[in-house]
């Protein structure tokens, strides 16, 4: 069982299923969790953030709160990054912290980028030597998650 789980979340609703999955993963052991959220900047030159620092910190604080309420030791981390560097930052921060496992969302993206493996989840899976667990989408039943978890 992992003792340090690095959980990467974004601002979309999928973060709730990622946090719930990480909570179940950590609940039965003395696992600690670090929740990571990157403030993504898009564009060229003077890139614009997709959200404010306050919005990003609120996303992380909410996730940490839910983990702590479930009895899981948790802390959060927010870092600015360019959209194309998010996967590298996830892997680098997880390694820097000494994580055993990285948890990412399982939401299916759209378009050719997902099919060709250009999504953040796919790039984390390719880049990391750590165990990477993909949280199932919210519509998957809790019983199935427990069986496969």
Question: Which role does the model predict for each range below?
Answer:
Residues 1-49, 72-75:
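Small/aliphatic-rich secondary-structure junction motif
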Residues 93-100:
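Glycine-rich phosphate-binding loop signature in dinucleotide/nucleotide-binding domains
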Residues 28, 35-62, 142-149:
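Acidic, proline/glycine-rich short linear motifs
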